[in-house]
Amino acid sequence: MILEILSMLLVSLLGVIINVYLFIRFATSKKRPFSSFHKLCLFKTVPNITICSIFSFYAVPLSIFQMTLETVPRVQNLVLSQILGGIAYPLGPFIQICMAINRFIVLFFPFAKMKFEFIPITNISILLCILLASCPVIVSVYTSCYLVYDPSILVFLPELEECVANLLLR
């Protein structure tokens, strides 16, 4: 189990360091105004930092101290697990989809003039991604179906197995 915890620590710390560096580089870029792709790259670092930080500074210490699910403070576990599994995990792929659409438009329509130049489409898409990524948290609040971190098996699981089964069957 030590090898698994050390590998989780190494990967997550490396992820925090690289993504914080990228965030700082993107945020302090002298090129203004930021392009759409630049904004998306900057924003993509946020869920990456969140995920890696929760693993580095929450999951790894709990696992190192060999805590069990019963000994971990429940509210803290619920909040951090919901941030991780309910917002940060879905947000990453949503931003990647926006990045892919952006690159598709730039590659295949390089000289096309966007009709909606005055509307900040990238900002709206980022906001939409945040709203979509928040849906699992909203659903879990209404269904009392939460994720929790179980340090004894190093994984985030649904707190009640039957609530997940009910969600899948509906």
Give, region by region, the residue ranges found by the protein language model.
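Seven-transmembrane-like multi-pass membrane architecture, highlighting hydrophobic TM helices
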Residues: 1-170
